[in-house]
Amino acid sequence: MNDVDKITGFLDSIAFSDGSAGNSKRNDIDKEGFFYHTTQKAWGGMALFNNDIARYRNHLMCELCIRYEITVLYSVVMPTHTHDVLYSKNWRNISDMYRVLNSSLVRYVSHRYPQRKGLRLFCERPQYTVIREMLHLFFLGKYVEDNASSRENEGKNAPYSCFWMFENGHFQPPYNKDIYEALFGIPFKELYEFYKTHSKKEVWV
């Protein structure tokens, strides 16, 4: 069974009901969901992620997501933080993936940038928000895309943005171009065009 079949099957049984979203402050994590918006902030708001570190993070995260059977819907790396929208049958898989990812990032940064060796890089663990409404999941695509495009509008770049795949149609695992139509009833190209031409307020409404 491929990712699209899995998600389509789960959509028949998942209750995207009241939109209540547990987050990861202290022990308040809702571990019963399938879709999560996760953020990871750099310690003290430092501009941790340059292009090199962002590329390494994306490459390793893709490998780990395949290993842990996680599907990535959206991902951007900003200089001071990251945004990922993920699907997994088991929240523990996501948690384990980030544990390995962040440990590897610390080692990579210490090796490549000796001046940062021994420094704290991250604000504790990632923040997890479970997604229980389809509208919320749909909106997050625009929210994540807006992070990257806002940098471009300022003449800067997001160190990494997954939306190059939406532009050229070349999706790589753990992404899957067919998932967006399975979820939202709209092909990825039309979805991306909608995100680019509508504001966050328009997408939410």
Residue ranges and their predicted role:
Residues 1-78, 87-205:
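Short Pro-Cys-Gly-centered "Cys-loop" motif that presents a nucleophilic cysteine in a tight turn
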